[in-house]
Design a protein with these regions (language model features):
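Structural signature of tandem-repeat unit edges
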Residues: 38-45, 62-75, 85-98, 108-121, ...
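Surface-exposed repetitive/solenoidal architectures
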Residues: 20-84, 105, 125
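Hydrophobic h-region of N-terminal signal peptides that target proteins for export
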Residues: 10-18
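Generic structural marker for isolated residues within well-ordered, non-membrane alpha-helices
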Residues: 6, 100, 169
Length: 240
Protein backbone atom coordinates (compact mmCIF):
# COMPACT_ATOMS: atom_id res chain seq x y z
CA UNK A 1 0.00 0.00 0.00
CA UNK A 2 2.84 2.36 0.86
CA UNK A 3 4.37 1.77 -2.56
CA UNK A 4 1.05 2.69 -4.22
CA UNK A 5 0.94 5.98 -2.31
CA UNK A 6 4.50 6.76 -3.36
CA UNK A 7 3.67 6.03 -6.99
CA UNK A 8 0.58 8.26 -6.85
CA UNK A 9 2.55 11.13 -5.33
CA UNK A 10 5.25 10.76 -7.96
CA UNK A 11 2.63 10.75 -10.72
CA UNK A 12 0.97 13.90 -9.38
CA UNK A 13 4.32 15.64 -9.07
CA UNK A 14 5.11 14.70 -12.64
CA UNK A 15 1.79 16.07 -13.90
CA UNK A 16 2.39 19.30 -12.00
CA UNK A 17 5.87 19.64 -13.39
CA UNK A 18 4.58 19.12 -16.93
CA UNK A 19 1.75 21.65 -16.61
CA UNK A 20 2.38 24.38 -19.15
CA UNK A 21 2.76 27.94 -17.97
CA UNK A 22 3.81 29.49 -21.29
CA UNK A 23 3.65 28.97 -25.02
CA UNK A 24 2.34 30.49 -28.24
CA UNK A 25 -1.20 31.77 -28.92
CA UNK A 26 -0.84 33.23 -32.40
CA UNK A 27 1.67 33.44 -35.26
CA UNK A 28 3.60 36.15 -33.44
CA UNK A 29 2.12 35.99 -29.95
CA UNK A 30 3.22 34.32 -26.74
CA UNK A 31 1.46 33.73 -23.44
CA UNK A 32 2.74 33.37 -19.90
CA UNK A 33 0.82 32.50 -16.75
CA UNK A 34 2.34 33.22 -13.34
CA UNK A 35 1.70 31.27 -10.15
CA UNK A 36 -0.33 34.16 -8.74
CA UNK A 37 -2.78 34.13 -11.64
CA UNK A 38 -1.55 36.83 -14.04
CA UNK A 39 -1.86 35.87 -17.70
CA UNK A 40 0.16 37.99 -20.14
CA UNK A 41 -0.33 37.99 -23.91
CA UNK A 42 2.73 39.50 -25.61
CA UNK A 43 3.88 40.08 -29.15
CA UNK A 44 2.27 41.55 -32.25
CA UNK A 45 -0.77 40.63 -34.35
CA UNK A 46 -3.86 38.48 -33.88
CA UNK A 47 -4.59 35.69 -31.44
CA UNK A 48 -5.50 32.17 -32.42
CA UNK A 49 -9.23 31.35 -32.56
CA UNK A 50 -10.11 28.58 -30.13
CA UNK A 51 -13.24 26.46 -29.84
CA UNK A 52 -14.97 23.74 -27.83
CA UNK A 53 -12.89 21.11 -29.60
CA UNK A 54 -9.68 23.17 -29.60
CA UNK A 55 -9.37 24.82 -26.21
CA UNK A 56 -6.89 27.55 -25.34
CA UNK A 57 -3.74 26.24 -23.62
CA UNK A 58 -4.76 27.98 -20.38
CA UNK A 59 -8.37 26.73 -20.54
CA UNK A 60 -10.00 25.81 -17.26
CA UNK A 61 -8.03 28.70 -15.82
CA UNK A 62 -9.93 29.10 -12.56
CA UNK A 63 -6.81 30.71 -11.09
CA UNK A 64 -6.47 33.42 -13.75
CA UNK A 65 -7.24 36.65 -11.90
CA UNK A 66 -5.77 39.25 -14.23
CA UNK A 67 -5.07 39.44 -17.96
CA UNK A 68 -2.50 41.80 -19.47
CA UNK A 69 -2.58 42.21 -23.24
CA UNK A 70 0.30 43.95 -25.03
CA UNK A 71 -0.55 47.08 -27.00
CA UNK A 72 0.48 45.46 -30.28
CA UNK A 73 -2.18 42.72 -30.14
CA UNK A 74 -4.85 43.32 -32.82
CA UNK A 75 -7.49 40.64 -32.19
CA UNK A 76 -8.72 38.63 -29.22
CA UNK A 77 -9.56 35.17 -30.53
CA UNK A 78 -12.77 33.17 -30.27
CA UNK A 79 -13.09 31.43 -26.89
CA UNK A 80 -9.81 33.02 -25.81
CA UNK A 81 -10.67 33.56 -22.15
CA UNK A 82 -13.88 31.54 -21.95
CA UNK A 83 -14.73 30.48 -18.38
CA UNK A 84 -11.89 32.28 -16.64
CA UNK A 85 -14.18 32.38 -13.63
CA UNK A 86 -11.73 34.07 -11.22
CA UNK A 87 -10.86 36.91 -13.62
CA UNK A 88 -11.42 40.32 -12.02
CA UNK A 89 -9.28 42.58 -14.22
CA UNK A 90 -8.43 42.80 -17.91
CA UNK A 91 -6.86 45.55 -19.96
CA UNK A 92 -7.89 45.70 -23.61
CA UNK A 93 -5.38 47.96 -25.39
CA UNK A 94 -6.16 50.48 -28.12
CA UNK A 95 -4.51 48.22 -30.68
CA UNK A 96 -7.34 45.65 -30.48
CA UNK A 97 -9.80 45.88 -33.38
CA UNK A 98 -11.90 42.75 -32.84
CA UNK A 99 -13.08 40.69 -29.87
CA UNK A 100 -13.99 37.16 -30.93
CA UNK A 101 -17.04 35.02 -30.31
CA UNK A 102 -17.32 33.78 -26.71
CA UNK A 103 -14.03 35.54 -25.92
CA UNK A 104 -14.93 36.37 -22.30
CA UNK A 105 -18.00 34.18 -21.90
CA UNK A 106 -18.45 32.93 -18.35
CA UNK A 107 -15.92 35.30 -16.75
CA UNK A 108 -18.24 35.40 -13.77
CA UNK A 109 -16.04 37.52 -11.43
CA UNK A 110 -15.42 40.37 -13.88
CA UNK A 111 -17.15 43.47 -12.47
CA UNK A 112 -16.08 46.25 -14.85
CA UNK A 113 -14.95 46.53 -18.41
CA UNK A 114 -13.54 49.20 -20.71
CA UNK A 115 -13.75 48.53 -24.43
CA UNK A 116 -11.43 50.92 -26.33
CA UNK A 117 -12.46 52.98 -29.35
CA UNK A 118 -10.23 50.88 -31.58
CA UNK A 119 -12.66 47.94 -31.35
CA UNK A 120 -15.02 47.69 -34.33
CA UNK A 121 -16.28 44.13 -33.83
CA UNK A 122 -17.62 42.44 -30.70
CA UNK A 123 -18.35 38.79 -31.42
CA UNK A 124 -21.36 36.68 -30.58
CA UNK A 125 -21.71 35.90 -26.86
CA UNK A 126 -18.40 37.69 -26.27
CA UNK A 127 -19.31 38.78 -22.72
CA UNK A 128 -22.30 36.54 -22.02
CA UNK A 129 -22.61 35.09 -18.52
CA UNK A 130 -20.29 37.71 -17.05
CA UNK A 131 -22.56 37.55 -14.03
CA UNK A 132 -20.82 40.22 -11.92
CA UNK A 133 -20.50 42.84 -14.67
CA UNK A 134 -22.42 45.94 -13.55
CA UNK A 135 -21.82 48.46 -16.34
CA UNK A 136 -20.38 48.63 -19.81
CA UNK A 137 -19.71 51.39 -22.31
CA UNK A 138 -19.70 50.32 -25.93
CA UNK A 139 -17.37 52.54 -28.01
CA UNK A 140 -18.62 54.58 -30.96
CA UNK A 141 -16.48 52.50 -33.30
CA UNK A 142 -18.91 49.55 -33.01
CA UNK A 143 -21.77 49.30 -35.53
CA UNK A 144 -23.34 45.98 -34.52
CA UNK A 145 -23.97 44.50 -31.09
CA UNK A 146 -23.79 40.83 -31.98
CA UNK A 147 -26.17 38.07 -30.96
CA UNK A 148 -25.96 37.34 -27.24
CA UNK A 149 -23.00 39.68 -26.77
CA UNK A 150 -24.04 40.67 -23.22
CA UNK A 151 -26.71 38.06 -22.59
CA UNK A 152 -27.17 36.77 -19.04
CA UNK A 153 -25.05 39.52 -17.49
CA UNK A 154 -27.32 39.35 -14.46
CA UNK A 155 -25.82 42.28 -12.53
CA UNK A 156 -25.70 44.70 -15.48
CA UNK A 157 -27.57 47.85 -14.47
CA UNK A 158 -26.21 50.31 -17.01
CA UNK A 159 -25.27 50.14 -20.67
CA UNK A 160 -24.31 52.94 -23.04
CA UNK A 161 -25.14 52.29 -26.69
CA UNK A 162 -23.39 54.80 -28.99
CA UNK A 163 -24.80 56.52 -32.07
CA UNK A 164 -22.63 54.35 -34.30
CA UNK A 165 -24.70 51.21 -33.63
CA UNK A 166 -27.21 50.30 -36.35
CA UNK A 167 -28.13 46.75 -35.28
CA UNK A 168 -28.80 45.19 -31.88
CA UNK A 169 -28.55 41.44 -32.39
CA UNK A 170 -30.72 38.55 -31.24
CA UNK A 171 -30.54 38.12 -27.48
CA UNK A 172 -27.91 40.84 -27.18
CA UNK A 173 -29.03 41.80 -23.65
CA UNK A 174 -31.36 38.90 -22.89
CA UNK A 175 -31.71 37.98 -19.20
CA UNK A 176 -29.91 41.09 -17.95
CA UNK A 177 -32.22 41.02 -14.97
CA UNK A 178 -30.88 44.15 -13.23
CA UNK A 179 -31.09 46.44 -16.28
CA UNK A 180 -33.65 49.15 -15.45
CA UNK A 181 -33.58 51.43 -18.48
CA UNK A 182 -32.07 51.67 -21.92
CA UNK A 183 -31.90 54.41 -24.52
CA UNK A 184 -31.64 53.23 -28.08
CA UNK A 185 -29.83 55.82 -30.23
CA UNK A 186 -31.23 57.26 -33.45
CA UNK A 187 -28.68 55.32 -35.50
CA UNK A 188 -30.36 51.97 -34.75
CA UNK A 189 -32.60 50.52 -37.46
CA UNK A 190 -32.95 46.90 -36.30
CA UNK A 191 -33.54 45.31 -32.90
CA UNK A 192 -33.16 41.54 -33.00
CA UNK A 193 -35.23 38.71 -31.62
CA UNK A 194 -35.31 38.49 -27.82
CA UNK A 195 -32.78 41.32 -27.62
CA UNK A 196 -34.10 42.45 -24.22
CA UNK A 197 -36.18 39.42 -23.22
CA UNK A 198 -36.31 38.53 -19.53
CA UNK A 199 -34.95 41.93 -18.51
CA UNK A 200 -37.45 41.86 -15.65
CA UNK A 201 -36.29 45.13 -14.03
CA UNK A 202 -36.60 47.11 -17.26
CA UNK A 203 -38.98 50.01 -16.65
CA UNK A 204 -38.47 52.22 -19.69
CA UNK A 205 -37.25 51.98 -23.24
CA UNK A 206 -37.04 54.79 -25.77
CA UNK A 207 -37.30 53.68 -29.38
CA UNK A 208 -36.29 56.31 -31.97
CA UNK A 209 -37.99 56.87 -35.31
CA UNK A 210 -34.99 55.31 -37.07
CA UNK A 211 -36.05 51.82 -35.93
CA UNK A 212 -37.86 50.02 -38.73
CA UNK A 213 -37.55 46.43 -37.52
CA UNK A 214 -38.33 45.02 -34.08
CA UNK A 215 -38.13 41.23 -34.17
CA UNK A 216 -40.30 38.74 -32.29
CA UNK A 217 -40.06 38.60 -28.50
CA UNK A 218 -37.69 41.57 -28.34
CA UNK A 219 -39.13 42.61 -24.97
CA UNK A 220 -40.58 39.25 -23.96
CA UNK A 221 -41.30 38.86 -20.25
CA UNK A 222 -40.49 42.49 -19.45
CA UNK A 223 -42.68 44.94 -17.54
CA UNK A 224 -41.94 48.34 -19.03
CA UNK A 225 -43.15 51.46 -20.79
CA UNK A 226 -41.74 52.05 -24.22
CA UNK A 227 -41.80 55.42 -25.91
CA UNK A 228 -41.14 56.30 -29.50
CA UNK A 229 -40.64 59.63 -31.18
CA UNK A 230 -43.72 61.22 -32.77
CA UNK A 231 -42.46 60.50 -36.25
CA UNK A 232 -42.19 56.76 -35.65
CA UNK A 233 -45.55 55.63 -36.98
CA UNK A 234 -44.59 51.97 -37.22
CA UNK A 235 -44.03 51.52 -33.49
CA UNK A 236 -46.27 53.96 -31.61
CA UNK A 237 -45.82 54.49 -27.87
CA UNK A 238 -47.56 51.96 -25.68
CA UNK A 239 -47.95 51.18 -22.01
CA UNK A 240 -47.68 47.45 -21.36
Amino acid sequence: MKQIYILLIALLMGLSANAKSSGTCGPNLKWHLTDDGVLTISGKGGMTDYSYSNRSPWYDGQNIKRIIIDDSVTTIGDDAFNECSALTSVNIPNSVRAIGNDAFRGCSSLTSLTIPNSVTTIGKYAFSYCRALTSVTIPNSVTTIADGAFGSCYALTSVTIPNSVTTIGDGAFSSCGALTSVTIPSSVTTIGKSAFSYCRALTSVTIPNSVTTIADDTFYNCIYNHRTTKTNQKYPSVNL
